[in-house]
Amino acid sequence: MVLLFLCSGCSTKETAELPADPVVAKLILAQEAAKVNYVEGETFDPTGLIVNAKMSDGTVVENVPFTLEVDTPLTRTTLFAVMRYEGKTVNQQLRITLLGNDEQYSAANMQYVPGSALEGKLFYWLGSSVTYGASACGESMADFLAKRDGAVCIKEAVSGTTLADVKKESYVQRFNSYLLSEGCAKHVDAFICQLSTNDRNMPESFGTVSGEQVREPEAFDCAMTFGAIEYIIAKVEEVWGCPVLFYVNPPLDENYETMVNGLEQIAQKWGIQIVDMYHDVAFNQLTEEQRSLYMADAIHPTRAGYRDWWLPKFEEALELAVKP
């Protein structure tokens, strides 16, 4: 009996392992937070969040406790809140509105001020993202000027486009299309064009300013930035004969400064007006708090920036332009 017992204990078969406890394989966002839209500076509210855990054995544990990781307060760069449980994470996407784009700064909430010298005037705006208001919910100084001063603004603006006619929907292409359209205005009180920040990425296409006697639109090389500017000015004079204003952004880089310098030569040749936000030191003296409120990035203003910072500059320039 003893011999049999010992032989039985010497079996070479492996001892069967007990099944391991299931572990968390991944987290599932079962229910989003009740509020996902915020203005920067607010605090995220996790009310409504439900997180489930899918286990390694295929089962699901519902409504697991989680730790929350999120910027407090929320910033313009906050993309999501992170829920963490047992080494796994799941994200709640957030949509953060810049403080300067809060509804209180919208054109809809801009008060009309009667008696403006710009009331009833028709202005044509040609530009790209800054003229469009790409970082301000599609609202720019043109929209605020129309609302406050009672002006009529035609805003021809497409983000990412250039003055130089080397890409689709360039300033030149769109302006020519408008001039050929059935709805082309017969009279414009002033023409305002953006010195595109997109052209600064193509310094090889800046070109040169033409001689004093070169005035016909067909004489200019529109594939060059400076040629396109002169072509546009010549066409405006030919079609409408109205004041022409070009506006320049606050300081950016050396390439943009080269463009500003070229525009100044062109302005002297053609007698056009520059809305100069590049060299205006007093205009650019902002506190960090103001800059954060007024600018979405180095190039694009927020609603508050257009309304409270840029608009008075354009009102002053346009009042001068339309003055009898």
Residue map of PLM features:
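Catalytic His-Asp segment of secreted/periplasmic serine-dependent ester chemistry enzymes
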Residues: P251-P324
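N-terminal secretory targeting modules
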Residues: C10-V23, Q93-L126, V130-C137, K147-R148, ...
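Solvent-exposed, low-complexity, repeat-rich "mucin-like" stalks and linkers
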Residues: P22-V60
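Active-site segments of SGNH/GDSL-like serine hydrolases
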Residues: Q194-N198, E230-E264
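A short acidic, glycine-rich active-site loop
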Residues: V214-T225, A296-P301
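Conserved SGNH/GDSL esterase-like catalytic core that processes O-acyl groups on lipids
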Residues: L122-W125, V130-V214, E218
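Serine/threonine-rich, repeat-prone extracellular segments and beta-strand-based repeat modules
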Residues: T59-V90, L94
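Bacterial N-terminal signal peptides
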Residues: M1-C7
